Structures are given as C-alpha cells and as structure tokens.
A protein has these predicted regions:
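Alpha-helical transmembrane segments
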Residues: 2-53, 93-120, 154, 158-175, ...
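Membrane-interface helix-loop junction between the first two transmembrane segments
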Residues: 52-70
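Non-transmembrane, extramembrane segments of multi-pass ion/lipid transporters
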Residues: 64-73, 237-242
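Juxtamembrane helix-capping/reentrant segments at transmembrane boundaries
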Residues: 67-81, 135-143
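Select subsegments of transmembrane alpha-helices in polytopic membrane proteins
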Residues: 78-90, 142-150, 253, 355-365
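Membrane-interfacial loop-to-helix junctions in multi-pass inner-membrane proteins
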Residues: 104-112, 131-146
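Alpha-helical transmembrane segments within multi-pass membrane transporters and channels
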Residues: 120-127
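Membrane interface segments of multi-pass transport proteins and intramembrane proteases
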Residues: 129-138, 171-182
C-alpha cells in the first residue's frame, strides 16, 4: 500500500523534478530489502503495542489454556494462561505485509490466503476446546478436511492462475532436477507433494508449541532463514550465481517472511518464560502453513526440513512413539514407548531438564539448522 502511494504516486509524480530531499528519498520504496526491513519492524511494533490489550481481553473472555492431566506439575501451573494469542501474530503479519508489500503479486496473496485459512482451522479448533468445552477440539477428520481444502486451493491457484514451474529444486545439486511437468509427471501428482508439505509443516509447528517460548523462538529463526532464501531466489543475479530457480514473484514473499520474523519476535516478548499468553492452534497451524506455502512458492521444498529442523524432529518423535506403541501392542500385546512422552521436548522434561534449558537448547539446534540451510546455497 505504501509502495503505491509513496513510490508509484509521489516519487514518480514529484521526485524526478523536485529538489526536495523528501520526494527524492521516496525512491527507497522500490527496494524490497528496505520494505522487508520495515515490514519486520512494523509487525514487531504492532505485536508489542497490542500484545497487552489482547492478552487482557483473552483473559476477560476466559480463553484459558487447558492442560492435559498427564503432563508435569510444571505444566499444570500454566492452566488458565490466556491462549489463542496467535491472532496477534496473524493480525500483525497481515497489516504489515499489506502496508509494505507490492499488492500485485499473486504469490503474496496466495501465501497470505493460505496462512489465513490455516489460522481459521486453528481458530475453530481452539474455539471448540475453550468455548464448547470439548477438550480435543475439532475431530481429526474435521481438522484434516480443513487442511486438505487449503492445500487443494493452493495447488489450484498455482495450476490455473500462475506460470508456476513444476520442477523440484534439489539442494546440493547444480542443476534443477526431477522435472514434474505434464510431459513427465502430471501436476496432479504434485498435489500430493503439496498436501504432504502443508499438512506436515502445519502439524509439526503445532506439536512444537508445548513450552514457553519454544515455537515462537524457533519460528523466528526459521522465518529469518526463509527470508534470506526468498530474497536470493527473487534476485536474478543472486539466483544465477547460486544456481537457484529464479522467481521474481517471490520478492514480495520476502516482505511477508520479514513480517513473520517481526511478529514472532514481538510475540516472544509475551510468550517467553513464564509465558503470559500462548499462541494456540490459531497461531501454530498458521505459522506452519506459512512456512510450507512459502517453501513451495520459492521452490525450497527440500530445504524445509533444514529450515525448520526442530519442527521436523518434534513431529518425527511423535510418529516414532505412536508407530512403536501400536506395533508392540499388536505383536506383544502390550504397547511400549520409545520416549517417556512425545513430542520430544516432553521427554526431556520428564528426564529432569528444566523448561528454560530445553527451550534454549532447542533454539541452538534451530540456529544450526538455519545456518545449514543457508550453507546449501554454496554447496551446489
């Protein structure tokens, strides 16, 4: 929005002929790096400014977190802490993105739309848990249906409304590989890939959101790495130099990712231990959906496990736990567990680690994964 008013209108109308430093200075609005930086700052400030009123309103509405009985006493003390704070993240991301991005990018609106749809699924889940007093929220089939519909819409827009490249960019390889165009593999097969990515990423972040500051801090790190990747993919010189799939449409996704960075950092201000608010499913599903959607749009699908390595580890720990329990129950008659409790952060907690230590160590691991994802740009 600001791009059109301050650059397209004021600068182009008055900047070239005016001697005013104000009008000439508006030239900076054409640069995606400038707009990304300010989208980050704007989202951060919105989250910080509105955080306290939102938390207070959630508390007044008695939108408190329910804690499962089997969790530790440390977790039981958090019962009643306001949840659904993810609306603060999503709202600040939407406002700052609309303010600072060019609004003629269909990829930008696709990322925003997918994020909002995943947020809607999470909101419904939280609402049923809290207001309807149904502890499990949406049924598994209902939640899956919402996620599948969103994935189908993402694929549909890519197929019918864009010139999206149906190729997969493989890390560590010089050439873009595995063509999946119509002549080789129909794009309908790519739909399965999109479903796998979006459902996997959204649920992985959802599983990670179990400790004060954990999901928000890991999101900040993962989104910072994804911001850098979207920028180099959008710049022809960097893309050619690093042998990436060049996608100029992803430039505005950089602004979107920057807004996510700022919003997650601002939310961490209130979510750091001891947490004053939790993001809830409305936040975690939306963040995971945003990560997956941007990875798909920028052809970084295979880098997503590195970008969000902690999220993947948490999800895999649950898969291992459930699979092993079912297998041993079927074969031995008694279900056995690999971990004391899944996701993995609960295993360490029951092992005697204090929550802040677990969070800080997971943050260190997230930083290492982010650096690894960025290093692949040169390892081709």
């Amino acid at each position: 929005m600001l791009y059109y008013f301050l650059y397209q209108f004021l600068f182009r109308e008055y900047g070239a002929s005016s001697e005013s430093y104000f009008y000439k200075g508006l030239n900076v609005f054409q640069y995606v790096t400038f707009r990304t930086a300010w989208a980050t700052i704007t989202a951060l400030l919105i989250t910080l400014f509105f955080g306290r009123p939102v938390i207070r309103k959630l508390a007044e509405m008695k939108f408190g977190q329910e804690i499962r009985e089997e969790l530790s006493a440390e977790h039981q003390a958090k019962r009643g802490t306001p949840t659904m704070g993810g609306i603060l993240i999503i709202g600040s991301v939407f406002i700052s993105t609309v303010l600072w991005a060019r609004l003629d990018s269909i990829f930008l609106w696709l990322a925003l739309g997918a994020t909002m749809l995943f947020a809607a699924v999470g909101f419904a889940d939280d609402w049923i848990k809290i207001v309807k007093k149904r502890s499990l929220g949406l049924t598994g089939k209902q939640k899956l249906a919402g996620q599948l519909i969103t994935a189908l819409l993402v694929w549909g827009v890519l197929y019918f409304a864009t010139n999206y490249s149906w190729n997969l960019s493989i890390p560590f390889l010089k050439e873009t590989a595995l063509p999946t165009g119509v002549s080789v593999i129909p794009p309908i097969i790519y739909l399965l890939f999109i479903i796998f990515i979006l459902l996997g990423s959204s649920n992985a972040v959802n599983l990670t959101d179990g400790m004060d500051g954990l999901a928000s801090s890991v999101t900040f790190i993962a989104m910072a790495a994804l911001t850098a990747l979207t920028y180099v993919a959008s710049d022809r010189r960097w893309a050619e130099y690093l042998d990436l799939t060049h996608n100029p449409a992803s430039a505005e996704l950089t602004v979107f990712c920057g807004a996510m960075v700022g919003a997650s950092l601002g939310f961490l201000w209130y979510n750091a231990p001891p947490a004053e608010v939790f993001m809830g499913d409305v936040g975690s599903l939306a963040i995971g959906g945003a990560l997956g959607t941007v990875a798909i749009l920028t052809k970084q699908e295979f880098l997503l496990p590195f970008i969000g390595g902690v999220f993947i580890i948490e999800a895999i720990s649950v898969m291992i736990q459930v699979s092993y329990f079912k297998f041993t129950k079927r074969t031995a008659g008694v279900g056995k567990r690999v971990f004391m409790q899944a996701p993995l952060h609960h295993h360490f907690q029951l092992s005697g680690w204090k929550e802040p230590k677990i969070v800080f160590r997971f943050v260190i691991i997230a930083i290492l994964f982010a650096l690894l994802s960025l290093s692949t740009l040169k390892l081709r």
